């Protein structure tokens, strides 16, 4: 009897609390508009996180969610010529492939349209702005975000967002903390709008050295501390090796460390090749991932798949994947499945034509097998040599 009374009292209290919450929600929506407050499970926009691929499968895996998240701020920083702009242009190309609209705010006034085209960017559809000062750049960014029509915005770079007062002043004038205050104010205004518009905003940043640091890293990024707090993802990209072909540099191998990640576990790393001719090399990343997940076996310099040898040296295997896109597609989907990433659509397989190289007729078959194989891309022909 006592238990029944206690249950009824508890049920009555629960109903009263529910009515009070509903009344409060109704009042908030009446005052601030519909959607100003809601239950998390009922908000599909917050429950499902859309992502934009980085163009590197290894980095997509390291990020834990398959790419850059929509409605968030991302910071990419690193030394000069480490691949920061290339990585963002690759993300723009992936956005355009999905039918999205991208914008590039070129504060450094250094965007090369021909290079962007080589990376797969549709330059005819890419929105580009070259602002005169930092305030103008950030106002352009805010206008694009508020349009709710842009999927990805890249700002290159934070260091080039020079405040108007500094531009109008004389050389040698002191403007202590002016850029940091500009970034802090802009990010306070932008963060909420970016989230509501579901736009991904990527800030490229540069590295500076702090003077007098005795312990720890003396490196820091420009623009103050605000961006470090507001960014959901921070990537540190470094060049670790120069790729050469017949003693000629043809690309860089880079390592990207996920310094901060609000969407998945941080501190993961990814390594991939960036070729000077066509950007991130997907085949090279696929080989590394396939070997790591035991989908492709490696014995010495030989690689084998399904019990059959597919090439000696990485370059031969890259050519094998280019000549057999179906096998590359199958392996990539296996890697994606093992890492809980969405699978690729078979209709989006891109084949690349493999051109033959003129040989000396006196060459034997054995000699031919040791010769470099060339393969073409949309932009130009790269020569691939065996390891």
UniProtKB/Swiss-Prot annotation:
SUPFAM superfamilies: P-loop containing nucleoside triphosphate hydrolases, RecA protein, C-terminal domain. Residues 350-369 have a biased composition (Basic and acidic residues). One of its GO terms (molecular function) is damaged DNA binding. ATP binds at residues 78-85. GO terms for cellular component: cytosol. Residues 350-387 are annotated as: Disordered. GO terms for biological process: DNA recombination; DNA repair; SOS response. It is found in: Cytoplasm. The keyword Transferase does not apply. Keywords: ATP-binding, Cytoplasm, DNA damage, DNA recombination, DNA repair, DNA-binding, Nucleotide-binding, SOS response. Coiled coil: none annotated. PROSITE patterns: RECA_1, RECA_2, RECA_3. InterPro entries: AAA+_ATPase, DNA_recomb/repair_RecA, DNA_recomb/repair_RecA_CS, P-loop_NTPase, RecA-like_C, RecA-like_N, RecA_ATP-bd, RecA_C_sf. HAMAP family: RecA. Can catalyze the hydrolysis of ATP in the presence of single-stranded DNA, the ATP-dependent uptake of single-stranded DNA by duplex DNA, and the ATP-dependent hybridization of homologous single-stranded DNAs. It interacts with LexA causing its activation and leading to its autocatalytic cleavage. Belongs to the RecA family. This is Protein RecA. The gene is recA.
């Amino acid at each position: 009897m006592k238990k029944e009374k206690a249950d009824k009292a508890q049920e009555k209290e629960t109903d009263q609390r529910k009515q009070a919450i509903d009344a409060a929600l109704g009042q908030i929506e009446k005052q601030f508009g519909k959607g100003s407050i809601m239950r998390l499970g009922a908000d599909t926009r917050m429950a499902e996180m859309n992502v934009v691929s980085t163009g590197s499968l290894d980095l997509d895996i390291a990020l834990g969610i398959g790419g850059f998240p929509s409605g968030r701020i991302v910071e990419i920083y690193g030394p000069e010529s480490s691949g920061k702009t290339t990585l963002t242009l690759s993300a723009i190309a992936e956005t355009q492939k999905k039918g999205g609209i991208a914008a590039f705010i070129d504060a450094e006034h250094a965007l090369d349209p021909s290079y962007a085209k080589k990376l797969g960017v549709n330059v005819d559809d890419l929105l580009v702005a070259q602002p005169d000062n930092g305030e103008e750049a950030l106002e352009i960014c805010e206008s694009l975000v508020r349009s709710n029509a842009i999927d990805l915005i890249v700002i290159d770079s934070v260091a080039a967002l020079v405040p108007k007062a500094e531009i109008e002043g004389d050389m040698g004038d002191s403007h202590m903390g002016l850029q940091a205050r500009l970034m802090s104010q802009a990010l306070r205004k932008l963060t909420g709008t970016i989230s509501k518009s579901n736009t991904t905003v990527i800030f490229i940043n540069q590295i500076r050295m702090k003077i007098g640091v005795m312990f720890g890293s003396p490196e820091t990024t420009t623009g103050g501390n605000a961006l470090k707090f507001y960014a959901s993802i921070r990537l540190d990209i470094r060049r670790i090796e120069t790729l050469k072909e017949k003693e000629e540099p043809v690309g860089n191998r880079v390592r990207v460390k996920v310094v901060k990640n609000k969407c998945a576990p941080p501190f993961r790393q990814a390594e991939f090749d960036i070729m000077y001719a066509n950007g991130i090399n997907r085949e090279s990343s696929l080989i590394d991932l396939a070997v790591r997940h035991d989908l492709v076996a490696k014995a010495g310099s030989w690689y084998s798949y399904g019990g059959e040898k597919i090439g000696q040296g990485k370059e031969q295997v890259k050519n094998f994947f280019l000549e057999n896109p179906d096998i590359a597609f199958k392996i990539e989907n296996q890697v994606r499945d093992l890492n809980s990433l969405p699978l690729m659509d078979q209709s989006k397989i891109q084949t690349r034509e493999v051109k033959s190289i003129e040989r000396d007729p006196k060459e034997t078959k054995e000699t031919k097998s040791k010769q470099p194989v060339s393969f073409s891309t949309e932009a130009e022909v790269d020569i691939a040599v065996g390891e």
